[in-house]
Swiss-Prot record:
Locations listed in the record: Cytoplasm
InterPro entries: AceGlu_kinase-like_sf, Asp/Glu/Uridylate_kinase, Uridylate_kinase, Uridylate_kinase_bac
UniProt keyword list: ATP-binding, Cytoplasm, Kinase, Nucleotide-binding, Pyrimidine biosynthesis, Transferase
Residues annotated for ATP binding in this entry: 15-18, 58, 62, 166-167, 172, 175
Regulation of protein activity: Inhibited by UTP.
Pathway note: Pyrimidine metabolism; CTP biosynthesis via de novo pathway; UDP from UMP (UMPK route): step 1/1
Protein name per the record: Uridylate kinase
The family this protein is said to belong to: Belongs to the UMP kinase family.
């Protein structure tokens, strides 16, 4: 793609759930899906878009769900945070194969031979001008989701838009898997989402986004060129503002 357009969103934060990387119950990381996602991100980066990614770990372990196995919540959350690092390394490796520079960032002192470094709010925007930034470990504390981390990082890097990549077409009035007649919302407010208790993000994430007027677009990564459509303002998925 040639950079001959004026883009509405020149700095974005992608929230990529771990669930988006898996296919079925056996393939915890599906490499066809990973290839598609990283290639679409590469195309945006080559257009001059600054990109931060907050990666989840739900395809491997979800801390809140480990208590049924007798694992304490705080330990489970740390296991979940380590899962985000594993997913981050997969993404980092795929960017390397595509000759795209990226940097893993940890919210606490943590280093893997220069691949991962600790977060520095004063350096992060300099890194974003040269590399794709992959935020691992959420916000680095238990009891907080990676959705909350995505909203927080989007605000800290002064992103124009938060894009939440999912396996569904957007936000529905009900679970479309249970009710095929559920309505797809094209545009809703934070207040409406909270009032209707729509299971999009947790309350903390919404509170952060609402306070800072951060627009969020939620869409299905399976749609061709979905990321490109989102940054040029196409009416894709659901917009929350």
């Amino acid at each position: 793609m040639k950079n001959n357009k004026i883009y509405i969103n020149k700095k974005i934060l992608l929230k990529l759930s771990g669930e988006c990387l898996k296919k079925g119950k056996k393939n915890l990381v599906d490499f066809d899906i990973l290839n598609k996602i990283t290639n679409e991100i590469k195309n945006l980066f080559n257009l001059g878009i600054q990109i931060g990614i907050v990666i989840g770990g739900g395809n491997l372990f979800r801390g809140s769900q480990l208590k049924i196995h007798g694992i304490k919540r705080n330990i489970g959350d740390h296991i979940g945070m380590m899962s985000t690092l594993i997913n981050g390394l997969f993404i980092y490796n795929h960017f390397e194969r595509l000759n795209i520079k990226s940097q893993l960032i940890s919210p606490f002192p943590f280093n893997i031979n220069g691949i991962c470094e600790s977060y520095n709010i004063f350096r992060i925007n300099k890194i974003l001008k040269k590399k794709i930034v992959i935020f691992c470990f959420g916000i680095g504390h238990t009891l907080f989701t990676t959705d909350s981390a995505a909203c927080l990082k989007a605000i800290e890097i002064d992103a124009n838009l938060l894009l939440k990549i999912t396996n569904v077409d957007g936000v529905f009035s009900e679970d479309p898997a249970k009710n095929p007649n559920a309505t797809l919302y094209k545009k809703i407010s934070y207040d409406y989402a909270l009032k209707k208790n729509l299971k999009i993000m947790d309350f903390t994430a919404f509170a952060i986004a609402k306070e800072h007027k951060l627009p969020i677009r939620i869409f299905n990564i399976k749609e061709p060129n979905s990321l490109y459509k989102a940054i040029i303002g196409k009416d894709i998925g659901t917009l929350i503002n």
